[in-house]
Regions:
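Extended catalytic cores of very large enzyme megasubunits
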Residues: 1-307
Length: 307
């Protein structure tokens, strides 16, 4: 069955994906098929196989934009997650520090990839920094660096870069993160709005949802030692080594997430424990973040959105 393109679909197809004088969907599919088959032993036969398959599937945007385009050094992968350590410059256990992570993310976006980050490892605002005898500014302040970087870097194909910022629900700065994109003036110009180059999501754990269900307290904790003022307010160290900065009523925290989402459509939520239970590679990895593009998980009723 052949489905005719709607006018808006044809216009967007031409704007985003046509290359080298292409004028039709058939020409686009032929170019993609040849590009994907280029390294096969029998590339002509494989190209025909790919072209036939393209009658039934829609590939990712980066493949549509770059496959078969000569002289273009870009990625054909849409989705990346950039690790970040709790360090400004130095790597920690092989994970790059904040500035190096920003450099790597800039390169990824320049080549066409969308990038997600878990900012939870970064110590909270008010945490103690022993090397400089000072207090940390928190992950939200460092997110400004990534936001500005994304504004500057034009992604492959001259499109704006895409970023997803994630913070765990038990991070001590989570309440500030929830309202980080709040704008009180509806007339504020778009280019002046906070974190306009980010989608934001809260990493929600089973522990939070269970505390919400029983109307219990929920601990906001981090491995970083808090500063003197936070200690004076009652912060304490748990048996697992993490510091509990404070406790909140779970339903109040969850309500803040829901109200912010209702008012501004952000932040979203990632059900981290559910995602990792459904991850086929859970025995060798833990998923802490996603990139900006939503995905689906197969379920009996069809594709189910875990986000």
């Amino acid at each position: 069955m052949t489905i005719e393109l709607q006018e808006v679909s044809a216009r967007e197809l031409a704007k985003k994906y046509f290359r080298g004088g292409e004028k039709s969907l058939a020409e686009l599919k032929a170019r993609i098929a040849c590009g994907l088959a280029a390294r096969e032993i029998d590339c002509e036969t494989q190209a025909r196989v790919f072209e036939e398959a393209l009658e039934y599937v829609i590939l990712g945007g980066r493949i549509n934009a770059t496959a078969g385009v000569e002289g273009v050094n870009t990625t054909m992968v849409n989705c990346f997650v950039q690790p970040i350590a709790d360090s400004v410059f130095d790597p920690v256990d092989g994970v790059p520090g904040i500035m190096e992570a920003a450099r790597q993310a800039a390169q990824t976006m320049r080549l066409g990839g969308g990038v997600g980050y878990d900012f939870s490892p970064i110590r909270p605002k008010g945490a103690w920094i022993a090397k400089t005898k000072s207090l940390a500014s928190g992950p939200i302040s460092y997110m400004e660096i990534f936001n500005s970087m994304c504004s500057t870097v034009i992604s492959a194909g001259a499109r704006r870069g895409a970023q997803m910022g994630i913070l765990r629900c038990d991070h001590p700065d989570i309440e500030d993160f929830i309202v980080a994109k709040r704008v009180d003036d509806a007339n504020m110009p778009w280019d002046r709005r906070p974190f306009r180059n980010f989608n934001l999501s809260v990493g929600v754990t089973d522990a939070l949802m269970q505390a919400v269900e029983v109307d219990g307290e929920f601990e906001l904790a981090h491995v970083a030692e808090p500063g003197p003022d936070i200690k004076a307010q009652g912060a304490y160290q748990r048996e697992d080594g993490k510091w509990v900065y404070r406790k909140v009523r779970a339903r109040d925290l969850y309500d803040k997430i829901i109200r912010a989402t209702y008012d501004r459509a952000e932040p979203g939520v990632l059900f981290l424990d559910r995602i990792n239970r459904d991850n086929n590679l859970r025995y060798i990895e833990t998923i802490a973040a996603t990139n900006p593009y939503a995905c689906g998980l197969p379920a009996e009723s069809g594709m189910e959105n875990p986000l």
